Design a protein with these regions (language model features):
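Short, small/polar-rich loop/turn modules that mediate ligand/substrate recognition or access, typified
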Residues: 178, 183, 249-251
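Conserved glycine-rich cofactor-binding loop
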Residues: 13-15
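Active-site helix of classical SDR
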Residues: 122, 162, 170
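Short C-terminal tail/terminal secondary-structure segment
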Residues: 151, 238-239, 250-263
Length: 263
């Protein structure tokens, strides 16, 4: 389906990023796995090789908030596999605090990881992606945002602001690149079974005295299906946006939330 397309995925060591890596590997992509933990990336690469024996995979550790780190990782990736054809900006971080206790350091951290990181990665891969698109290989940029990019949630104001920024960046860049063979879209998952949600559960437990089951139910309650979204469901949506026939899907922010935003 996507044979030999070079896909670079940030936050690829676990959760949604790992699920996306598997989907794209099964579709025939060559993969560059990026993240801060080399051990997690190595473990994920070994898991991919076990499930997709012929996968071509490179580990390129990076901190998306560090421009030099991003450019070094992208240079390494392009030296191995050529221009990046599919960029999945998945790296993210959430931290909850009342706005009055959200200091400038926390605010900047949330923007740096969740918004500026996407900017850094797009800046680094775009020249090569555009060159490849001009030669007939379409480019895809998929930003993993959040329902927090489409609505508000209390006590995560910095995260919400950053994810709204990702949605805005997606729309603006989609228009800019619309005639250049590159599409830009955002996937906006609701609460998903990931490390971020597990940390949120522990935070609820420690601050409210609720049981873990009660905390998970509190997060699931926003989903009309009364459950957490699964990483594989997000990954399937990414594959759809990258596959043949998706050229007209551009500048969209697609909620994967069981209908949370429908009401």
């Amino acid at each position: 389906m996507l044979n030999n397309r070079h896909s670079l995925i940030t936050g690829a060591g676990a959760g949604i990023g790992a699920a996306i890596a598997l989907q794209l590997a099964q579709a025939g992509c060559r993969l560059t796995l990026c993240g801060r933990s080399q051990d997690k990336l190595q473990a994920q690469a070994e898991e991919l090789r076990a499930q997709v024996p012929d996968v071509a995979v490179l580990i390129a550790p990076m901190d998306v908030g560090d421009e030099q780190s991003v450019h070094a990782a992208v240079q390494q990736a392009q030296a191995r596999f050529g221009p990046v054809n599919i960029l999945v900006n998945n790296a993210g971080q959430a931290h909850s605090a009342p706005f009055a206790k959200t200091d400038a350091a926390l605010w900047q951290q949330m923007l740096n990881v969740n918004l500026t990181g996407s900017y850094h990665c797009i800046q680094a891969v775009l020249p090569g992606m555009l060159e490849a698109a001009a030669s007939g290989t379409p480019g895809r940029i998929v930003n993993i945002a959040s329902t927090a990019g489409l609505k508000g949630y209390a006590y995560v104001s910095a995260y919400v602001a950053a994810k709204h920024g990702v949605v805005g960046l997606t729309k603006a860049l989609a228009l800019e690149l619309a005639r250049k063979g590159v599409t830009v879209n955002a996937i906006c998952p609701g609460y998903t079974e990931t490390d971020i949600v597990r940390e949120a559960v522990q935070n609820i437990v420690s601050k409210t005295g609720k049981s873990e089951a009660e905390a998970r139910q509190a997060l699931s309650a926003s989903n009309p299906q009364q459950r957490l979204v699964q990483p594989q469901e997000v990954a399937q949506s990414v594959l759809w946006l990258c596959a043949a026939g998706s050229d007209a899907i551009n500048g969209q922010s697609i909620a994967i939330d069981g209908g949370e935003l429908a009401g």
